[in-house]
Amino acid sequence: MNIGTVPIIACSFLLPTSSLLAQSESKDSYSEQAKFYPSEKIEWKDGPPALPKGAKVAVLEGDPAKEGAFVMRLLFPGGYHIPAHTHPRTERVTVISGALYLAMGDKLDRSAAQKLSPGTYGFWPSGMKHAAWADGETVIQLHGIGPWVITYLNPAEDPRNANKSL
């Protein structure tokens, strides 16, 4: 056998295998698992107690309250704001519509905020201190690893503490 025939023989063994792999991973094999969420069919619910009243949420994948990956959309009414806070895990946010303003630091400093327009993607690392507000009705898509936790820098601004002072 000459050295030039070795690659040809090796390829002849690999071709049937790669053909089988391609068949097992065909587009049709994934159709039962695919899920689509047209914007007009998304079912919005009241936001979680950890967010100020007025937010709406739609969980698209996973469960933000449990360990593991999740995707959720948040709808904020115009003027809605979230006081300065942190998250123990990285957040990945895409603005779908409206405008989200993000200010880094201990307080909601509107003069130092970054405007995130539709289509903007943002990545905020775990522990980053930030505040946000919506200019007009705003929808964002948040990707994260649960459980999703928000810790307000000022406990008095945490909506979960509102009823504790009564």
Description of each model-found segment:
Residues 1-5:
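Positively charged n-region of N-terminal signal peptides that target proteins for export
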Residues 7-18:
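Bacterial N-terminal signal peptides
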Residues 23-70, 114, 157-166:
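A short, N-terminal "cap"/entry segment at the start of jelly-roll beta-barrel domains
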Residues 33-35, 111-114, 131-166:
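Double-stranded beta-helix
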Residues 57-60, 71-80, 84:
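N-terminal post-signal-peptidase region of extra-cytosolic proteins
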Residues 77-80, 86-107:
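Glycine- and acidic-residue-biased ligand/ion/polar-headgroup-sensing regions
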Residues 82-84, 102-103, 124, 129-135:
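Short beta-strand His + acidic residue motifs that chelate non-heme Fe in jelly-roll/DSBH
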Residues 106-126:
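Short acidic-glycine-tyrosine-enriched beta hairpin
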